[in-house]
């Protein structure tokens, strides 16, 4: 069960190393929510391109040992898992950002068998493995940049 109001999300951005139409793709979210689900609004990534995501959030209380567990699904099948340590957060901090990956870039596969829909489910935990927030989003790996804007 999620402990409400400790983490509140403010923004979601997909950042690309190269992309026609701009390097940043901002997706609107409900500001102040600790449970964001953007899976119905996927964005497209060209196979072989480098990208990362940036999530803006705020914390209303101190958080010890904040981690983000990242679960990747391809066509609803578990595909991979990762955990990224965020660390300790002070109370009433408004301008925090979570970057994934923290260093470098993710690269979308160029193999035709890897093209298709992906869903990322991020679970933010802290204060002794307490569930604090969830953030879900989807993207489609395609052979080109056609329809690079989010699908509404």
Swiss-Prot record:
<dbReference type="GO" id="GO:0035023">
    <property type="term" value="P:regulation of Rho protein signal transduction"/>
</dbReference>
<comment type="similarity">
    <text>Belongs to the Rho GDI family.</text>
</comment>
<dbReference type="GO" id="GO:0007266">
    <property type="term" value="P:Rho protein signal transduction"/>
</dbReference>
<dbReference type="InterPro" id="IPR024792">
    <property type="entry name" value="RhoGDI_dom_sf"/>
</dbReference>
<keyword id="KW-0963">Cytoplasm</keyword>
<dbReference type="GO" id="GO:0005094">
    <property type="term" value="F:Rho GDP-dissociation inhibitor activity"/>
</dbReference>
<dbReference type="GO" id="GO:0005096">
    <property type="term" value="F:GTPase activator activity"/>
</dbReference>
<comment type="function">
    <text>Regulates the GDP/GTP exchange reaction of the Rho proteins by inhibiting the dissociation of GDP from them, and the subsequent binding of GTP to them.</text>
</comment>
<keyword id="KW-0343">GTPase activation</keyword>
<dbReference type="InterPro" id="IPR014756">
    <property type="entry name" value="Ig_E-set"/>
</dbReference>
<dbReference type="GO" id="GO:0005829">
    <property type="term" value="C:cytosol"/>
</dbReference>
<dbReference type="GO" id="GO:0016020">
    <property type="term" value="C:membrane"/>
</dbReference>
<protein>
    <recommendedName>
        <fullName>Putative rho GDP-dissociation inhibitor 2</fullName>
    </recommendedName>
</protein>
